[in-house]
């Protein structure tokens, strides 16, 4: 069974994609409420209740776009290129930017890093100047701090190049 939240990369928030073998759905506990049984949706061809038609329409448009971009293979290659560019920029900064996540555990979608040893004032300035340069949403989660850059499918390589150029210039003028 594959259960995937679709938000940000496949469609709007709230859409979930489920791919399940029929035999797994049939083995599920029959005492579950009807709405919670995958066999119900298989039997009714996903139309047991009113589906979120606009959200499904958007997922369809995104799937067409993904296909036009070379399918999953093309998107994966592009996302790997974007992530490598950003991680390489962090790695080449002589410690000015530091990723707290080990190489083998790093995400290609959400890159977290600290600036100037985690100096909150410098990180706040980084976020402010990045936003002024059109690079919005770089501050990390309020409970963790640091910076967080999301490289979702729709983010272009050119946008990541603009970010890494900004990062090098920010380091040059402040580091």
Regions found by a protein language model. Name each.
Residues 87, 106-110, 144-146:
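Active-site lining segments that contact anionic ligands and/or coordinate catalytic metals
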Residues 20, 113-117, 151-153:
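Short beta-strand-to-loop capping motifs
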Residues 1-3:
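Internal gly/pro-rich beta-alpha loop/helix module
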Residues 96-100, 134-140:
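A short linear hydrophobic-aromatic micro-motif
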Residues 89-93, 125-134, 166-173:
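Generic non-transmembrane alpha-helical segments
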Residues 97-130:
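Conserved PLP-binding catalytic core of the aspartate aminotransferase-like
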Residues 6-87, 102, 173-175:
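Active-site C-terminal subdomain of aminotransferase-like
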Residues 132, 141-175:
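PLP-dependent enzyme catalytic core of the Aspartate aminotransferase-like
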């Amino acid at each position: 069974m594959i259960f995937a939240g679709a938000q940000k990369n496949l469609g709007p928030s709230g859409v979930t994609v489920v791919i399940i073998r029929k035999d797994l759905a049939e083995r599920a506990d029959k005492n579950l409420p009807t709405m919670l049984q995958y066999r119900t949706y298989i039997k009714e061809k996903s139309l047991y209740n009113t589906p979120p038609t606009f959200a499904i329409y958007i997922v369809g448009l995104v799937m067409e776009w993904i296909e036009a971009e070379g399918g999953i293979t093309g998107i994966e290659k592009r996302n790997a290129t974007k992530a490598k560019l950003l991680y390489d920029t962090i790695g080449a900064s002589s410690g000015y930017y530091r990723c707290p996540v080990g190489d083998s555990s790093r995400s290609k979608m959400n890159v977290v890093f600290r600036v100037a040893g985690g100096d909150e004032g410098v990180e706040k300035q980084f976020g402010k100047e990045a936003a002024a340069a059109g690079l919005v949403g770089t501050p990390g989660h309020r409970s963790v701090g640091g910076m967080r850059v999301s490289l979702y499918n729709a983010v272009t390589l050119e946008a990541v190049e603009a970010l890494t150029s900004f990062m090098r210039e920010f380091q040059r003028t402040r580091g």
